[in-house]
Amino acid sequence: MCIRDSIIAPNDIGWTKSLGLLMLQIPDILNRFKPDIVLLAGDRAETFIFSIASFYSNYFIAHIQAGELSGHKDGMARHAIGKLAHIHLASNHDAKERLIRLGEPEFRIFQTGAPQLDDIVNGNIKSDSINVIKKQLRINLEKKFVLCIMHSSSDELKINSYVKLTYEALRRRGFFQVWILPNSDSGSEKISREILKLPKNELAVAQNFSRTNFIELLKNAELLIGNSSCGILEAPAVGLPSINLGIRQKGRIQAKSVFQILNPNLKNIDKSIEECL
């Protein structure tokens, strides 16, 4: 079941109604499979809905990457999921300590790391070659490129402007830009429109990639810029510098290769690009 398939409209009302429809489907799924444990990950709205349905259907819940900060409404959802979960799988010591401060019994908390990094660290990624991926995106094989991922953030009124600022800063430096359209959150349609309005020369737009091909893109990019959590997690794991714009990932533990800009403008984005490279 994919939440994107059930989206009524990518705005606040449509998104909320879609979550309601999802809630109606989950009890039947749980009744069909009768799991011993419902394993949930992260802070997505659909994960929160699944935790509510599982809790009130009397299923045991384990929560991956519990206790982290997200910097926007998903962070609130993460902590709400934590209150319904029975086992908390924290990715780092900071998250573990936060769970304790939130009142969770320490014997239920396990520091397990971020599982999405395991295949990267262990070298188990099998993807198409970067040249094959570049051809699919119509990128010159010799051209250096920057990966751009911008998701909606309900707490930031100017987030749509980050797209134009990022494009202009990279254009001035002559980088080919690979933009990945945002997830299905409320407000995503506005960001998608801004991305699709960008000039198409020296730029490629993709809906999504397989995880393996996405990791291969990260390994071969010059830089990642935007507000996706992959700039905090996967990018440092492959040695890629990243620039996080706005507050979406504010407060999370970050590697030294992550540059945080809380109030983006053309000048400080350009300065961060220079420092990254």
Feature names for model-found ranges:
Residues 13, 128-220:
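Donor-nucleotide binding loops and adjacent catalytic segments primarily
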